[in-house]
């Protein structure tokens, strides 16, 4: 009799076990659903936007070889400049005798084009995920505003160097056709201004408590810079009677 009681008791224990006992999520990983359903995690994800910004003080930056520059190489930057360690004659990417001098294929180590579009894809993906995010509206607005701001910043830097560039607004998968045509300079400016308009509407005012994060004032500053660039002689023939870009 006791033997049968043990069997019945064991059966009850087994039947009481959770069916998903062996279907546990990895404890060392988070899914996208986890990230975009939590404001703190979504903010941490958006923090990576700041790592996309181009570092203007690295030894690879071509602007670092001018007499007025701050050059980061080894120890003292001023010492490197003062000692003429790098000049237009010694810097290989400006030396015409060194495989053709400076052009796009000679500065691939800067990764300006690749890093910009890598960041743009990252931001586009973030914007898609944030549309269905259940986090609080205030958090959602500010994070979305940051994404629009950084996309505008990246495109602003691109058009300064290349003029019109392809405008990528979607997230492409491995099997998608992703060849894009080059937009005109004016089309790029209009696209960037639209992103900055959204950024200004969504970003919060300046707050010392979050010093260093994008805010409404910074978006306005970039907008002013962009419109000055668009109206400059660099992108407008000074002899042209037509008005400059707005």
Residue ranges, per PLM feature:
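Acidic, serine/threonine/proline-rich low-complexity intrinsically disordered regions
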Residues: 169-172, 234-246
């Amino acid at each position: 009799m006791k033997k049968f009681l043990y069997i019945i008791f064991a059966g009850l224990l087994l039947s009481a076990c959770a069916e998903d006992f062996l279907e546990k999520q990895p404890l060392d990983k988070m899914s996208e659903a986890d990230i975009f359903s939590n404001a703190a995690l979504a903010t941490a994800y958006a923090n990576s936007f700041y790592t996309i910004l181009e570092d203007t003080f690295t030894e690879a930056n071509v602007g670092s070889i001018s007499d007025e520059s701050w050059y980061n190489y080894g120890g003292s930057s001023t010492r490197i400049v003062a000692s003429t360690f790098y000049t237009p004659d010694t810097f290989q990417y400006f030396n015409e005798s060194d495989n053709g001098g400076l052009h796009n294929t000679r500065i691939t180590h800067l990764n300006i084009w690749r890093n910009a579009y890598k960041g743009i894809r990252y931001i586009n993906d973030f914007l898609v995920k944030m549309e269905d995010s259940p986090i609080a509206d205030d958090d959602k607005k500010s994070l979305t505003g940051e994404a629009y701001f950084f996309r505008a910043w990246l495109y602003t830097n691109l058009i300064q160097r290349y003029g019109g560039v392809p405008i990528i607004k979607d997230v492409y998968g491995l099997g998608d056709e992703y060849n894009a045509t080059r937009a005109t300079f004016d089309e790029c400016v209009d696209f960037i201004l639209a992103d900055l308009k959204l950024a200004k509407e969504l970003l919060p005012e300046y707050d010392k408590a979050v010093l260093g994060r994008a805010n409404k004032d910074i978006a306005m500053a970039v907008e002013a810079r962009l419109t000055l660039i668009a109206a400059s002689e660099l992108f407008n023939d000074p002899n042209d009677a037509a008005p400059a870009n707005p």
